[in-house]
Amino acid sequence: MSLQSTMWTGGPILLIEDEPSVIAFLRAALERRGYSVVNAGSGSEGLKRLSAGKFAGVISDIRMPGKVNGAEVHAWIQKNRPELRTRIILISGDTANSETQTLLAQSGTPCIEKPFRVQQLMSVVEKTFGKP
């Protein structure tokens, strides 16, 4: 029997996503499994929440409109929130994009490609954040 590699640290998961339907889907799936969720509708809002609060992990879309995208959120976390460096999951509908491929290859951060199923999401969430 192997030990779970990631332990749940408690606290909410920060969900950074600009599409309301994806936010609703992710929030419902995570809350059904016992996670609490705080959402941010843009990368800028996500950075504000990260600056002010404590989170167990972050799930962020890579491509979002506005001044701050998911790659920039990822870079900010690496620099400013070392406790979250390995507790990030990226989501993207465009993993064929060369910038996205470079980010994923260089960072080793888990990425879930849209569209995805609840079980696929939860498998990555539990491996990355642990179970509540």
Regions found by a protein language model. Name each.
Residues 34-41, 49:
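Short hydrophobic/Thr-rich beta-strand motif most characteristic of the beta2 strand and flanking loop
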Residues 24-32:
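Charged docking surfaces used in two-component/phosphorelay signaling
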Residues 1-14, 79, 84, 101, ...:
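Non-catalytic signal-transmission and effector/linker regions of two-component phosphorelay proteins
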Residues 17:
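Conserved acidic carboxylate
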Residues 40-44, 70:
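Conserved Asp/Asn-Gly motif in the active-site loop of CheY-like receiver
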Residues 61-62:
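Active-site residues of response regulator receiver
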Residues 48, 69-84:
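Short amphipathic alpha-helix used as the core "switch/output" element in two-component signaling
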Residues 89-92:
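Hydrophobic/aromatic residues positioned on beta-strands within the core alpha/beta folds
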